[in-house]
């Protein structure tokens, strides 16, 4: 059984990674508010072990409002209301699954526990400043994560929504993985083809064809 520690454990000893952590520490030390909290930065890896990954859902950088980001792409901790992009994901789920019920929260931990790696490509952000840590070096780290999944696993579903995610995933081997692309679920672009993309059902169709247990997208109310 391969773990994240086996696959990317040596990243943490690399100078570029030490530099990322130093920049995050420096930002916090200077009084800036950085999201998510330090203990939550690597939550995606804690909740979805390397050999348990079935689906990779790429986000961009964490939510930059108070109490939103907790280390899982698109997800927010209760009682924070689901942001617009996540609401649009729920709407698409309702379109694909008529019996899907809108959850009363925005936590996607149940997806993560089933094998959906909710990976932002940049893992920290300054409060109120979208993309403020985009040049810290996180992209190098998450490129290595995606590369490891691409090389060492097979029959994964990669959900690439929006041009940033699609560019990030352009090297994925489509002969051994399923790559699904659509516009981002943001209100700015959801109507250009995210709605009606069918990705949630297509994901489960692919998993089923390869004898992999499907994702139950329905989230329990809390």
Swiss-Prot record:
SMART domains according to UniProt: UDG (SM00986), UreE_C (SM00987)
Protein's UniProt keywords contain Hydrolase: yes
PROSITE patterns recorded: U_DNA_GLYCOSYLASE
Gene3D superfamilies: Uracil-DNA glycosylase-like domain
Disulfide bonds: none
GO biological processes: base-excision repair, AP site formation via deaminated base removal
One Gene Ontology term of the molecular function aspect: uracil DNA N-glycosylase activity
Entry function: Excises uracil residues from the DNA which can arise as a result of misincorporation of dUMP residues by DNA polymerase or due to deamination of cytosine.
NCBIfam families: PRK05254.1-1, PRK05254.1-2, PRK05254.1-4, PRK05254.1-5, ung
Family from the record: Belongs to the uracil-DNA glycosylase (UDG) superfamily. UNG family.
Protein name as catalogued: Uracil-DNA glycosylase
Species: Actinobacillus succinogenes (strain ATCC 55618 / DSM 22257 / CCUG 43843 / 130Z)
């Amino acid at each position: 059984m391969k773990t994240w520690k086996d696959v990317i454990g040596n990243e943490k000893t690399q100078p570029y990674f030490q530099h990322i952590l130093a920049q995050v520490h420096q930002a916090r030390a200077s009084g800036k508010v950085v999201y998510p909290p330090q203990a939550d930065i690597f939550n995606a890896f804690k909740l979805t072990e390397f050999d348990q990954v079935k689906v990779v859902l790429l986000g961009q950088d964490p939510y930059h409002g108070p109490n939103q980001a907790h280390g899982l792409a698109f997800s927010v901790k209760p009682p924070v209301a689901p942001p617009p992009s996540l609401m649009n994901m729920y709407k698409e789920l309702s379109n694909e699954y008529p019996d899907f019920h809108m959850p009363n929260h925005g936590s996607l931990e149940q997806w993560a526990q089933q094998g959906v790696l909710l990976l932002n490509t940049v893992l920290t952000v300054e409060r109120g400043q979208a993309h403020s840590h985009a040049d810290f070096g996180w992209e190098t780290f998450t490129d290595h994560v995606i590369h490891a999944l691409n090389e060492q696993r097979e029959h994964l579903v990669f959900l690439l929504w929006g041009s940033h995610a699609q560019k990030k995933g352009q090297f994925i081997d489509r002969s051994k993985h399923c790559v699904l692309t659509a516009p981002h679920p943001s209100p700015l672009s959801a109507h250009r083809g995210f709605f009606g993309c069918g990705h949630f059902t297509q994901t489960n169709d692919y998993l089923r064809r390869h004898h992999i247990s499907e994702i139950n997208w329905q989230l329990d109310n809390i």
